[in-house]
């Protein structure tokens, strides 16, 4: 009967839930980093004839269902190319975005070149190569 009259322990039960929405609003206002639920994919442009659209072929290694040998599987994705930058043969990275059309949910961006990483690794150590010493 304390619950209806407002006396005693009954009010203390409600004091805790009333304070919890305040803490929830504080946590929601914090700036959270963007969630990257999917890894970026890298592939080769195989068709660039459409306007602002490129077809990208992504190759991945997956185990064979029966023999478990890792085999190459290819899949084509339609990607958005807003500036029509890419041509057939370019290596691009696919970033997951909101759906742009029925089949386009990826954005094509230039892939970081692999050759520059290898060349820069020796310079990062600060030790000149033999060819640079002579």
Curated annotation (Swiss-Prot):
Membrane spanning residue stretches: none
Classification via Gene3D superfamilies: Nucleic acid-binding proteins
CDD domains: Ribosomal_uS17
Chief site of localization: plastid
Signal peptide range: none
Transit peptide residue numbers: 1-37
Domain of life: Eukaryota
Listed GO biological process terms: translation
Family: Belongs to the universal ribosomal protein uS17 family.
Protein name as annotated: Small ribosomal subunit protein uS17c
Gene name for this UniProt entry: RPS17
């Amino acid at each position: 009967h304390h619950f209806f009259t407002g006396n005693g322990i009954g009010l203390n039960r409600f004091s805790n839930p009333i304070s919890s929405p305040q803490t929830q609003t504080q946590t929601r206002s914090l700036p959270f980093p963007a969630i990257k639920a999917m890894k970026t994919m890298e592939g080769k442009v195989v068709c660039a004839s459409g306007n602002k659209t490129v077809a990208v072929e992504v190759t991945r290694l997956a185990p064979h269902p029966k023999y478990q040998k890792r085999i190459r599987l290819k899949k084509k994705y339609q990607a958005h190319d807003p500036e029509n930058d890419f041509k057939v043969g370019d290596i691009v990275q696919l970033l997951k975005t909101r759906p742009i059309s029925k089949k386009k949910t990826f954005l094509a961006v230039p892939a970081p070149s692999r050759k520059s990483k290898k060349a820069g690794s020796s310079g990062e150590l600060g030790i000149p190569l033999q060819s640079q010493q002579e």
